[in-house]
Structure formats: structure tokens, C-alpha cells
Amino acid sequence: MTERTLVLIKPDAVARGYVGEILGRIERKGLTISALELRTAPGDIAAAHYAEHEGRPFYPGLLEFITGGPLVAAVLEGPRAIAAFRQLAGGTDPVEKAVPGTIRGDFGLEAQENLVHGSDSVESAEREIALWFPQFAAN
């Protein structure tokens, strides 16, 4: 079954020059890039994207980080795209949970600045794609 997922190549990955490497891994996995945009995240979209973390101690720093520089937002499509990208990304904590061969395992240093975001479910993907790419929401 073809799925869609939202991927963010976060500001730390952009600043460190990993956009091409990450996009290459996505393409080599066989996922289709349906939308791609380099942008700085507006505060309202960032807050809505991370709303589930509101009130947690790391929330203000997370918003500051994600809005603090350019990022790449993308919609990927393919069979089991959500799980496929999450496998490419690796565990959330790049040092303790991400294995070598994954994006975070190969390039990550910190849990919050962990290079990429990928939707974790079909429901999250639909909500996140509607935030970042409203033109895809009805499709």
C-alpha cells in the first residue's frame, strides 16, 4: 500500500551540509519525493507541529531550534513510506538508540538536534502534511 509521510530535514542537518546525503538515501530506498521546499519554519506551524510536547521542559528550546534556521520539508510516497523512512532515520537519540547505517546513527550527536523528523503514523502524516503542505491535504 502506498503511503505518504512528512519528512523534515532539520536546521542542524542543513547547517552541517547533509541535505544531499539525506535526500540520496531517501531516493536509494525507493521512496518518491512528491514535494520539497527549503524554508524557515514559521512559529505557528512549528507550534502546531510539536503541539503534543507543549508544557514539557524541552518545548521552548525545541521551537527555538526548529525555527532558528532553514530546514527542508518534504512529502515522501511509497509502499510503507512511514516505516521505511523511520528505518532510514534511526532511533531518536543518535548516540544511544540509532545504529550505524542510519541517518542519525551516522551523523547525529544530540537527541533534540537529531537531523530529521518523520511522521510516526498515518494519522500524524496526514496532520503534518496538512500543516506544511496544505495543497496536499485534500489529495
Swiss-Prot record:
Question: Matching PROSITE patterns, A to Z?
Answer: NDPK (PS00469), NDPK_LIKE (PS51374)
This protein's cofactor list reads: Mg(2+)
Biological process according to GO: CTP biosynthetic process; GTP biosynthetic process; UTP biosynthetic process
Q: What Pfam families is this protein classified in?
A: NDK (PF00334)
Q: Name one GO molecular function term.
A: metal ion binding
The catalysed reaction is:
a 2'-deoxyribonucleoside 5'-diphosphate + ATP = a 2'-deoxyribonucleoside 5'-triphosphate + ADP; a ribonucleoside 5'-diphosphate + ATP = a ribonucleoside 5'-triphosphate + ADP
Q: Where, by residue number, is the active site?
A: 117
Is Cytoplasm one of the keywords UniProt gives this record? yes
Where does the record say this protein resides? Cytoplasm
List UniProt keywords, sorted A-Z: ATP-binding, Cytoplasm, Kinase, Magnesium, Metal-binding, Nucleotide metabolism, Nucleotide-binding, Phosphoprotein, Transferase
Just give the chief location class. Answer: cytoplasm
Q: Where does ATP bind?
A: 10, 58, 86, 92, 104, 114
Q: Its Enzyme Commission number? A: 2.7.4.6
Give the superkingdom in one word: Bacteria
Question: Which is one Gene Ontology cellular component term of this protein?
Answer: cytoplasm
Q: Which NCBIfam families match?
A: PRK00668.1
Q: Its function?
A: Major role in the synthesis of nucleoside triphosphates other than ATP. The ATP gamma phosphate is transferred to the NDP beta phosphate via a ping-pong mechanism, using a phosphorylated active-site intermediate.
Protein family membership: Belongs to the NDK family.
How does this protein assemble?
Answer: Homotetramer.
Family matches, as HAMAP family: NDP_kinase
Instruction: Write the protein's name.
Output: Nucleoside diphosphate kinase
